Design a protein with these regions (language model features):
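N-proximal short alpha-helices
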Residues: 26, 42-45
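Activation segment
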Residues: 33, 43, 64-66
Length: 115
């Protein structure tokens, strides 16, 4: 499916969904920097609509790519820390208390702020 160009008004509505934050990591983003992520990827049959669009920072949009929300969450849980722990410098920093790995509540920003 070919992507369409979002209008300024549509971009603004998507941006305001989470008050200028990335829907996934929660970092503050400027509307000019915002990337639009399709919650269900177009390649997976998702609609090219505002309802299927989330504001995303560049990094989250890149790594989520065409993954489902479930698969993206599992990639974060299993992949990131596992890959970091393979790095000698990470293990040293962790051993000496220079960094700590915190437990993640397994919720994206948009899930944490739901009313």
């Amino acid at each position: 499916m070919k992507r369409r160009k979002w209008t300024k008004e549509e971009r603004k509505r998507i941006y305001q969904k989470y008050k200028g934050h990335c829907a996934y990591c929660g970092c503050k983003i400027r509307i000019e920097e915002m990337q639009i992520d399709h919650i269900v990827a177009l390649k997976r049959g998702g609609a090219d609509s505002i309802e299927n669009a989330n504001p995303a920072c560049r990094m989250c949009n890149k790594y989520k790519d065409t993954l489902t929300l479930y698969d993206f969450k599992n990639w974060l849980l299993a992949g990131v820390i596992g890959r970091l722990r393979k790095l000698f410098i990470f293990r040293i920093a962790e051993r000496y208390g220079m960094i700590t790995v915190n437990e993640w509540d397994k919720k994206f920003y948009f899930e944490r702020i739901k009313k």
